[in-house]
């Protein structure tokens, strides 16, 4: 199992090009199932989760061509509607093939998903919506078995999600695009990745209004065609590298990104003392001195994203003062706290609240990555620490950060990937 060896006391500075967003690429790849003609997707990040989903849809008989960051899918040869546990177990987003399969082919059998263990994150909202559209849903031996109503077409309906769910919103708008009649969805997620998916569906011939709002109306069409589309930049990768500048008194320029995707995070960075400048496709963070303490409350978009909570907490560990974090999205997303404390942080957790008392510096220690975003917070903390830190279970970071060592080295981080079996 690979590990990172990081020699700290780095000043994180330089330029880094941001990849396409993993959380956008996955639903866009799933949406390709809906198209009767080939679809080409650009700016696709080379990540384990992406490779897994490509393998998953390829196993259905879909012809896939990949060249660089471009993926083309032709669904003419699809011959099964099955998503096996062996692939689904590692990645939660695999449930997103359920809606497209059910909508286009009238049936699907998809294993219940895996992914980061940061909360229950149930798929019941997906299933309730499909049932409201007339589908028959059963769960047997860990598999969701779905069947469209008589005639093979889902039926448009009015449905409001009980809670804001990004995956649920994505799954249902894909299904509704080919449903018979009109679907009105309430309490939709507003995340940029949801907007990106809706825009691609429109490019494929879908009729969707209310994109980017809590109420979307989807008028079902008979068929969807392929298109050429580019994945939106990864706002979380952007924020993660900018966070490194704040932790180390650095200066980081992120390219191929957009400040419009990251407004609540950039505002907090400015509150912490950073100088933030931006243009159409770049953001720069400059930092001098210790960060200032802040209070963070995670919320669905357009609030502060839970996927940046761990990285900003790592900055707060070095802040002048006490910061308070309230995690409102997932009930188990403080697993990085014991690891940051091993590096010399002073954090106490009580339920959904974490109180962070700033310290002068981190000190090197062996730590263990617990989930995707926590792993990046530990990498940045280790880069700021004095001495050598060994980070275990870095397969988490490979799921969400493309070419991470190359990009970190370009920013001045002394990082080496080692195999613990060597």
Swiss-Prot record:
GO MF assignments: UDP-N-acetylglucosamine 1-carboxyvinyltransferase activity
EC number: 2.5.1.7
Entry's Gene Ontology BP terms: cell division; cell wall organization; peptidoglycan biosynthetic process; regulation of cell shape; UDP-N-acetylgalactosamine biosynthetic process
Cellular component GO terms held in the UniProt record: cytoplasm
Binding site for phosphoenolpyruvate: 22-23
Substrates-to-products reaction catalysed: phosphoenolpyruvate + UDP-N-acetyl-alpha-D-glucosamine = UDP-N-acetyl-3-O-(1-carboxyvinyl)-alpha-D-glucosamine + phosphate
Residues at the catalytic site: 116
The keyword Cell cycle is assigned to this record: yes
Enzyme class (EC, first level): transferase
Listed pathway(s): Cell wall biogenesis; peptidoglycan biosynthesis
Cell wall biogenesis/degradation is among the record's keywords: yes
HAMAP family linked: MurA (MF_00111)
Protein name, per record: UDP-N-acetylglucosamine 1-carboxyvinyltransferase
Taxonomic lineage: Bacteria, Pseudomonadati, Pseudomonadota, Gammaproteobacteria, Moraxellales
């Amino acid at each position: 199992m690979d590990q990172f060896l990081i020699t700290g006391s780095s000043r994180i500075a330089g330029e880094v090009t941001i990849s396409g967003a993993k959380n956008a690429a996955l639903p866009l790849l799933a949406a390709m199932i809906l198209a009767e003609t080939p679809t080409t997707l650009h700016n696709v990040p080379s990540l384990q989760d992406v490779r897994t989903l490509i393998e998953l849809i390829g196993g259905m008989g879909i012809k896939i061509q990949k060249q660089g960051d471009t993926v083309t899918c032709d669904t003419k040869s699809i011959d099964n509607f099955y998503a096996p546990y062996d692939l689904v177990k590692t990645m939660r987003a695999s449930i997103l093939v359920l809606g497209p399969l059910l909508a286009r082919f009238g049936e699907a059998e998809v294993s219940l998903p895996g992914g980061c263990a940061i909360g229950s994150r149930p798929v019941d909202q997906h299933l309730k919506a499909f049932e409201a559209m007339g589908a028959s849903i059963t769960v047997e031996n860990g598999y969701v078995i779905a069947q469209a109503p008589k005639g093979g077409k889902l039926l448009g309906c009015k449905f409001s999600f009980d809670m804001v769910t990004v995956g649920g919103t994505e799954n249902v708008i894909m299904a509704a695009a080919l449903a018979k009649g009109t679907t009105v969805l309430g309490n939709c997620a507003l995340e940029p990745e949801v907007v990106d998916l809706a825009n691609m569906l429109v490019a494929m011939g879908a009729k969707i209004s209310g994109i980017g709002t809590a109420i979307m109306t989807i008028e079902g069409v008979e068929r969807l065609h392929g298109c050429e589309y580019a994945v939106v930049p990864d706002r979380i990768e952007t924020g993660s590298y900018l966070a490194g500048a704040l932790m180390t008194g650095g200066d980081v320029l992120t390219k191929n990104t957009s400040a419009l995707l990251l407004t609540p995070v950039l505002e907090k960075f400015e509150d912490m003392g950073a100088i933030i400048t931006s243009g159409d496709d770049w953001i720069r963070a400059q930092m001098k001195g210790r960060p200032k303490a802040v209070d963070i409350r995670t919320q669905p978009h357009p609030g502060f994203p839970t996927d940046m909570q761990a990285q900003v907490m790592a900055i707060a560990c070095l802040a002048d003062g006490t910061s308070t974090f309230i995690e409102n999205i997932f009930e188990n997303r403080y697993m990085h706290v014991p690891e940051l404390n091993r590096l010399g942080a002073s954090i106490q957790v009580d339920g959904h609240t974490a109180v962070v008392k700033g310290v002068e510096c981190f000190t090197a220690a062996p730590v263990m990555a617990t989930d995707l975003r926590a792993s990046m917070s530990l990498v940045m903390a280790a880069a700021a620490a004095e001495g050598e830190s060994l980070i275990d279970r870095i397969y988490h970071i490979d799921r969400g950060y493309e070419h991470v060592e190359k990009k970190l080295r370009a920013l001045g981080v002394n990082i080496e990937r080692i195999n613990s079996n060597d």
